[in-house]
Amino acid sequence: MTMTAHTRETTSMSDAQDKAGTLIEALPWIQRFAGTTMVIKYGGNAMVNDDLRRAFAEDIVFLHHVGIHPVVVHGGGPQINSMLSRLGIESEFKGGLRVTTPEAMDVVRMVLTGQVGRELVGLINSHGPYAVGMSGEDGGLLRAVRTGTVVDGEEVDLGLVGEVVGVDPAGIKDILDAGRIPVISTVAPEILDDGNGSGPTTGQVLNVNADTAAAAVASALGATKLVILTDVEGLYANWPDKSSLISSLTASELRDMLPRLESGMIPKMAACLKAIDEGVERAHIVDGRLPHSMLLETFTTAGIGTQVVPDEEVNA
């Protein structure tokens, strides 16, 4: 009888050892975060690049399988813009900011809940029956009040745009308790502002910022982490100096920096600050253009992006 000998290339064995080393490096982080809740705000280039979309779904499924409870909160600006253009609906701007008219709000609602959310649920569920889509309207999950903005010292009405002032996490917890992954679109019923987020609804639905919505959800769930995917490497002390990337800062340090930040980073960093102030242990800005960036941040010693931590942790 003739036996065929099979040999392994030295390089393949080296690659295998590297992979084993990566798994061992991840072990203490898997042990630390198993059983905890992580809220991830999904947005930016990760939403429109097919490879990044698939990688994001893989990351969420990986988190689920190592015992973490991921909750995904998403916007959908590029998809909304595309649909408005296809339908011939002209966008109105005031002070450089989009005004959400009733006609535009119908599109926002349709795209976020009926397109972006469904596509993301489908990507995750290509790996198994894990994800369940939700809207901020479902079960009174989110409550919002209408907000405008100030441009050149004057109040500007942005239409059906709101800020989340209340979260009822019961529906999310039910899905998590069932072993599923909630995927939440950021539209919310409007309520009359009574100062504590529990006023009566008006019957109107508002478009809310996904960063601040994710922070509110993280706070309501008592999440261990809030992760916001964006299109930059993190927070820079002196933008655009790439060497000034900040790896970690305290809530007080961020509070001092906030008024001086670039306008595009303000809502994201304000969301991180809100989450930390309301008891979330860590808030992170992570580059969503990098495949598997969430896993690199969570399960490697070096981490990536910028993390915000409570003052007490540094002073302890």
Curated annotation (Swiss-Prot):
List the keywords (alphabetical): Amino-acid biosynthesis, Arginine biosynthesis, ATP-binding, Cytoplasm, Kinase, Nucleotide-binding, Transferase
What Enzyme Commission number(s) appear in the record?
Answer: 2.7.2.8
Describe the reaction catalysed, as an equation.
Answer: N-acetyl-L-glutamate + ATP = N-acetyl-L-glutamyl 5-phosphate + ADP
Chain sites annotated for binding substrate: 76-77, 98, 207
CDD domains attached here? AAK_NAGK-C (cd04250)
Site positions (Transition state stabilizer) are: 41, 268
What GO MF annotations does this protein's record show?
acetylglutamate kinase activity; ATP binding
Task: Cite the annotated pathway.
Answer: Amino-acid biosynthesis; L-arginine biosynthesis; N(2)-acetyl-L-ornithine from L-glutamate: step 2/4
**Main subcellular localisation:** cytoplasm
A Gene Ontology biological process in which this protein takes part is:
L-arginine biosynthetic process
Question: What protein family is recorded?
Answer: Belongs to the acetylglutamate kinase family. ArgB subfamily.
Role description: Catalyzes the ATP-dependent phosphorylation of N-acetyl-L-glutamate.
Official protein name in the record:
Acetylglutamate kinase
Give the species this sequence originates from: Paenarthrobacter aurescens (strain TC1)
- Gene (name only): argB
